């Protein structure tokens, strides 16, 4: 659980990737401008417009499938078990990270290519994972133990997000995109190992 709450905050770095893509590829600005974008206010505004538009579409493309899938997951997991609800979001995360890595590696791809990362939401995303975790905890624990375990889930959630946010900047600064997205992939792999 700690890994899965930590992982999404590390990928905030993808915003930097999107800004780089839009600046260098979509708008075809000089690399000097893109590396010092805050010093070029007019260029920065143009980049922000395109990035905001792509982010809006990405949010729509990731939210709608996850909402629809999540509506059916609770009853489905009553029949088919809880583990798929823990595994499917991990698969989606791996697909999303793959799209981010491809974007980082293929510097000539436009910013809109990052919209393909929304394919991960077809696996339920964060909502499906939480449904799976809370349902699994309810199935395997009783009384006092259930309360304690649910409190631990909340603790990991509230610690994981700020920790991931705090570490994403230094990891990106010293290791670049591959370090951040690679770490997310490794952590997702560790989740697979624990779930199976």
Q: Which residues fall in each region the model found?
A:
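Conserved MFS/SLC helix-loop-helix module at the cytosolic interface between two early adjacent transmembrane helices
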Residues: 65-110
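Glycine-rich segments within core transmembrane alpha-helices of 12-TM secondary carriers
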Residues: 59, 127, 145-173, 179-181, ...
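Paired intracellular helix-loop junctions of major facilitator superfamily
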Residues: 24, 124-128, 138-146
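Pair of pore-lining "gating" transmembrane helices in MFS-fold secondary transporters
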Residues: 1-38
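Hydrophobic alpha-helical segments of secondary membrane carriers
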Residues: 58, 116-122, 134-137, 150-156
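Residue-level signature of mid-helix packing/kink "hotspots" within the transmembrane helices
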Residues: 59, 63-71, 161-162
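Hydrophobic core of transmembrane alpha-helices in multi-pass small-molecule transporters
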Residues: 95-128, 136
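Membrane-interface helix-entry/capping residues at the boundaries of transmembrane alpha-helices
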Residues: 55, 86-89, 146, 150
């Amino acid at each position: 659980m700690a890994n899965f709450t930590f992982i999404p905050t590390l990928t905030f770095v993808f915003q930097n990737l999107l800004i780089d893509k839009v600046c260098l590829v979509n708008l075809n600005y000089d690399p000097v401008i893109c590396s010092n974008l805050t010093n070029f206010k007019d260029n920065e505004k143009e980049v922000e417009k395109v990035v905001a538009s792509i982010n809006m579409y990405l949010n729509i493309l990731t939210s709608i499938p996850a909402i629809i899938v999540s509506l059916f997951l609770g009853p489905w997991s009553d029949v088919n078990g809880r583990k798929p609800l823990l595994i499917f979001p991990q698969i989606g995360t791996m697909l999303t990270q793959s799209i981010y890595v491809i974007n980082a590696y293929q510097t000539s791809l436009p910013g809109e290519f990052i919209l393909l990362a929304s394919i991960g939401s077809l696996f339920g995303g964060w909502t499906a994972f939480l449904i799976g975790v809370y349902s699994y905890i309810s199935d395997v624990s009783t009384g006092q133990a259930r309360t304690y375990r649910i409190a631990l889930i909340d603790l990991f959630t509230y610690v994981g997000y700020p920790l991931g946010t705090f570490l994403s900047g230094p990891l990106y600064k010293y290791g670049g995109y591959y370090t951040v997205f690679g770490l997310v992939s490794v952590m997702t792999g560790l989740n697979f190992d624990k779930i199976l």
